[in-house]
């Protein structure tokens, strides 16, 4: 057979196969485009594990008609113009391959609108060929609908996994973005059912506690800066492990990466038995010019130009924070009733469901409230505000050194001190603090960290809250009123307090 040049259409199909391996990679590329378009709300919908449909909708900047027609061509991007831009890249996409690859191997519908345009542009593409361009209506943003992935590559189509496996991979890909982009409202829908709904939050670690539920059994959070590196994370206590690496998430400059080097550091510090792995969500921020992310089309492989420096910094941060010993044992009285005493009877129309949920009707939406989660948050805020904690005598002698302002604050929390000569001796501590944890606690206080103290307050609130299924009308009414006064979104552990559905969304669901 003679050597010949391949047709352009075949070249594009082959290239598409290198970027798009399965439906989860469609999710990845489209969500990255949404985030690069400055969206703060992203909805991912899949059908049949993404094999029949992947739809990603956002409220980003959108595209003009001219831009969308350019965007579906290979090696077109708004992210970079030169090699200098590539070295400093901060966006998710930059290769100009994603959308062009997707449209080559699917039936694609793109609807997009900029805030300047009166109407949206709709483009229908089949196997890379533009079939129709029209105008339609939608708010500013973009929806990309990808149907029948690999319909024109039957062998590739047949090689896709079962719908349940493909769904799991799509969900895991979605969760990778939800973990790092806490300021974005994320929704994941499978076959018409909402699987995840994450309202935007200012707390970076809330999502981790929702997605990685076993973290709630024991975790440590930290945020440190070493030289030109910033390292933040939420990691499991040593005794909380998994039999695999499914709880391991590394982010470099907000990009999810797979790194054996970082994994080795994690395992070295934890020093766990064979076939046991920690749960860890780690965020590393560094100068983009000290990274090479253009190694693989998927962009999930990264090379640090100063690898040893990064590894040493991560090891130092993990070692220091895992050395902290905190134990959870708290009992309080009267706080629960006092926390609710500030609320007036609710003026909203609402009703109690199963003695654990409140369904509330407002002018523009229905709210479904988890009363136990809300009660936890109310008590948590009350404890933070009032600082009413019982004390217990400390059996062993602990000497510390504190400035006057911290000494006064701690005394209000239930600590008691006594000067013996020039030494400051701790006599009493709040009930929640165990003997073993006292010295480490004071090290934290001296250096300004209160994170673990807040964690204990949250756990105390959990024990004080009325149990799910045991709420009466009076307590529920006060909680509903407090919800609309305070606008609480999460319980202290990070679980959602409420779910909101607008009447517009309700009409859309019933196809009105």
From Swiss-Prot:
Gene Ontology MF terms: ATP binding; ATP hydrolysis activity; ATP-dependent DNA damage sensor activity; mismatched DNA binding
Q: Does the keyword DNA repair apply?
A: yes
The UniProt keywords, alphabetically, are: DNA damage, DNA repair
Instruction: Point out the signal peptide segment.
Output: none
Q: Which GO terms describe its cellular component?
A: mismatch repair complex
Task: Read off the PROSITE patterns from this record.
Answer: DNA_MISMATCH_REPAIR_1 (PS00058)
InterPro entries, per database record: DNA_mismatch_repair_CS, DNA_mismatch_repair_MutL, DNA_mismatch_S5_2-like, HATPase_C_sf, MutL/Mlh/PMS, MutL/Mlh/Pms-like, MutL_C, MutL_C_dimsub
One biological-process term from Gene Ontology? Answer: mismatch repair
Record flagged with keyword DNA damage: yes
What CDD domains does this protein's entry cite?
HATPase_MutL-MLH-PMS-like (cd16926), MutL_Trans (cd00782)
Lineage top rank: taxon: Bacteria
What HAMAP family does this protein's entry cite? Answer: DNA_mis_repair
What does this chain do?
This protein is involved in the repair of mismatches in DNA. It is required for dam-dependent methyl-directed DNA mismatch repair. May act as a 'molecular matchmaker', a protein that promotes the formation of a stable complex between two or more DNA-binding proteins in an ATP-dependent manner without itself being part of a final effector complex.
What is stated as this protein's family in its record? Belongs to the DNA mismatch repair MutL/HexB family.
Q: What is this protein called?
A: DNA mismatch repair protein MutL
């Amino acid at each position: 057979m003679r050597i010949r040049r391949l047709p352009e259409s075949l070249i594009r199909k082959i290239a598409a196969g290198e970027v798009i391996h399965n439906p989860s990679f469609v999710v990845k590329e489209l969500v990255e485009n949404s985030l690069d378009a400055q969206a703060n709300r992203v909805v991912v919908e899949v059908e049949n594990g993404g094999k029949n449909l992947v739809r990603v909708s956002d409220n980003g900047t959108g595209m003009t008609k001219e831009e969308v027609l350019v965007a579906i061509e290979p090696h077109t991007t708004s992210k970079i113009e030169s090699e200098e831009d590539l070295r400093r890249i901060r966006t998710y996409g930059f290769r100009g391959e994603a959308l062009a690859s997707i449209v080559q191997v699917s039936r694609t519908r793109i609807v997009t609108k900029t805030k300047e345009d009166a109407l949206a542009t709709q483009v229908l593409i089949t196997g890379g060929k533009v079939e129709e361009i029209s105008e339609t209506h939608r708010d500013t943003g973009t929806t990309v609908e990808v149907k029948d992935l690999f319909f024109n590559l039957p062998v590739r189509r047949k090689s896709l996994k079962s719908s349940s496996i493909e769904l799991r991979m799509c969900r895991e890909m979605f969760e990778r973005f939800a973990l790092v982009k806490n300021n974005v409202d994320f929704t994941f829908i499978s076959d018409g059912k909402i699987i995840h709904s994450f309202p935007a939050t200012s707390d970076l670690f809330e999502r981790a506690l929702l997605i990685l539920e076993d973290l709630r059994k024991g975790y440590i959070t930290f945020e440190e800066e070493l030289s030109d590196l910033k390292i933040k994370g939420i990691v499991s206590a040593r005794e909380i492990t998994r039999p695999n690496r499914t709880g391991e998430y590394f982010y470099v400059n907000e990009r999810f990466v797979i790194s054996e080097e970082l994994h080795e550091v994690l395992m070295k510090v934890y020093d766990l038995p064979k076939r046991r792995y920690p749960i860890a969500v780690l965020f590393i921020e560094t100068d983009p010019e000290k990274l090479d992310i253009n190694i693989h089309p998927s962009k999930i492989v990264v090379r640090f130009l100063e690898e040893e420096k990064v590894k040493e910094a991560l090891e130092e941060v993990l070692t220091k924070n895992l050395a902290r010993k905190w134990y959870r044992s708290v009992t309080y009285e009267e706080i629960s009733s006092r926390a609710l005493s500030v609320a007036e009877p609710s003026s909203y129309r609402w009703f109690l469901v199963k003695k654990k949920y409140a369904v509330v009707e407002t002018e523009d939406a229905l709210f479904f409230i988890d009363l136990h989660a809300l009660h936890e948050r109310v008590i948590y805020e009350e404890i933070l505000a009032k600082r009413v904690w019982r004390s217990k005598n400390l059996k062993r002698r602990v000497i510390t050194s504190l400035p006057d302002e911290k000494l006064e604050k701690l005394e209000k929390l239930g600590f008691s001190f006594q000067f013996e000569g020039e030494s400051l001796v701790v006599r009493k501590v709040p009930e929640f603090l165990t003997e073993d944890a006292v010295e480490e606690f004071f090290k934290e206080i001296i250096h300004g960290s209160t994170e673990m103290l807040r964690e204990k307050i949250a756990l105390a609130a959990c024990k004080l809250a009325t149990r799910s299924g045991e709420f009466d009308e009076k307590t529920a009414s006060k909680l509903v009123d407090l919800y609309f006064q305070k606008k609480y979104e999460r319980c202290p552990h990070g679980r959602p307090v409420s779910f909101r559905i607008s009447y517009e969304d309700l009409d859309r669901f019933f196809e009105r």
